[in-house]
Amino acid sequence: MEFQKEILKGYIDIIIVSVLQEKPMYGYEIAKTIKGKTNENFEMKEATLYVSLKRLEKKNYLEGYWNDDKGTGGGRRRYYRITKEGKEFFKEKVNEWNLLKKLLNNFMEVHFNEKN
């Protein structure tokens, strides 16, 4: 089923914070996880991801740090982990989303029932 990817643009920050609830990750890993969780229906552009990560760090929702382990098979990677403020942000957004979902369901159910 096709959907307007523009709809997700307003939710990019919460999508990133949601993914980081699982564990700290580096940028490419975050993008790959998002792509997988959406069954490859949504792919976050690298520029969008890093602008969002920077914004979330500035708001103190995420904390970035460099992993200097030699076992990564490449250069240094910047990992991101969720902060206490980030967890609060996530909780607020989940509550907001649940309310929005209820409101929209009222309209969708009415419309669906009228068509049948």
Regions of interest found by a model, annotated:
Residues L49-L56:
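Basic amphipathic alpha-helical segments that dock to polyanions
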Residues M1-K5:
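Short, Lys/Arg-enriched N-terminal segment that forms or immediately precedes the first helix
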Residues G27-I30, L56, W97:
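Alpha-helical transition-metal enzyme core signature, strongest for iron centers
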Residues K87-N116:
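Amphipathic alpha-helical dimerization/coiled-coil segments
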Residues E6-T48:
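N-terminal helix-turn-helix DNA-binding core of bacterial DNA-binding proteins
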Residues E57-G75:
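Beta-hairpin "wing" of winged helix-turn-helix
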Residues I82-G86:
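Accessory beta->alpha helical hairpin/"wing" motif in late/C-terminal subdomains of nucleic-acid enzymes
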